[in-house]
Amino acid sequence: MAAASEPVDSGALWGLERPEPPPTRFHRVHGANIRVDPSGTRATRVESFAHGVCFSREPLAPGQVFLVEIEEKELGWCGHLRLGLTALDPASLAPVPEFSLPDLVNLGHTWVFAITRHHNRVPREGRPEAEAAAPSRPPTLLVEPYLRIEQFRIPRDRLVGRSRPGLYSHLLDQLYELNVLPPTARRSRLGVLFCPRPDGTADMHIIINGEDMGPSARGLPAAQPLYAVVDVFASTKSVRLVQLEYGLPSLQTLCRLVIQRSMVHRLAIDGLHLPKELKDFCKYE
């Protein structure tokens, strides 16, 4: 739900004037070292550090987020996940390039962003790079449950990756909604989407744990099918897709927010007289 003081732009919400997009899946075409599970929602690189390029099964709709969570890491490699969009049909790629950067990009009509542990934010026009690189904390879910990117509103709840409670003391931040995970950490959530512009082009945006990193690329062909690109590269070994709730939050999500309002931190949820499955849901486990 949008804040009471801010009117909702109905054209920016799914389910009001346009149908919600179908669930995201990985394409059957992928790098030689990738194995996709039968559900099409988990991609794992089984050897080496390369040949890990994956694609979305279908082209993305405007404003649709292709969101992945890092499930497994592998020590000994230098580099991390890469994320982006391509206007190339994955079915036409034989073989799939070894790397998204630079191999796939060099084929043209492809835009890929290398995720790093720090400094993923893109400087805005008229603002210094130092300001863009400065760490920031996004509004909490209870204050602003939507992430606004250009003309789109995206429910923030599932965009944010969270570590398991009890592992680190800093996870006791108020309401455990703050962005405490490094972008390349296990359980971090990263997404890509495109936003059409009036001139017929589109901007590509990268989302990291609920924060918009700004337009990572401009001038994309909005009229052409755009597929998501996920390069399970180097220290990133396995990712899974996360499905978003578009439009209004579900009753389940709203109930979780009500429970969280009365909690000091996640560990306090264990003391509630609730079924374990519900406690885990409230703790994002």
Curated annotation (Swiss-Prot):
Pfam families: Neuralized, SOCS_box. Coiled coil: none annotated. One of its GO terms (cellular component) is cytosol. It comes from the Eukaryota. The keyword Cytoplasm applies. Pathway: Protein modification; protein ubiquitination. Residues 1-20 are annotated as: Disordered. Its main location: cytoplasm. GO terms for molecular function: ubiquitin protein ligase activity. The keyword Cytoplasm applies. Residues 250-285 form the SOCS box domain. CDD domains: SPRY_NHR_like. Plays an important role in the process of myofiber differentiation and maturation. Probable substrate-recognition component of a SCF-like ECS (Elongin BC-CUL2/5-SOCS-box protein) E3 ubiquitin-protein ligase complex, which mediates the ubiquitination of proteins. Probably contributes to catalysis through recognition and positioning of the substrate and the ubiquitin-conjugating enzyme. During myogenesis, controls the ubiquitination and degradation of the specific pool of CTNNB1/beta-catenin located at the sarcolemma. The SOCS domain mediates the interaction with ELOB and ELOC, while the NHR domain may be involved in ubiquitination substrate binding. Probable component the ECS(NEURL2) E3 ubiquitin-protein ligase complex consisting of ELOB/Elongin B, ELOC/Elongin C, CUL5, RBX1 and NEURL2. Interacts with CTNNB1. This is Neuralized-like protein 2. It comes from Homo sapiens.
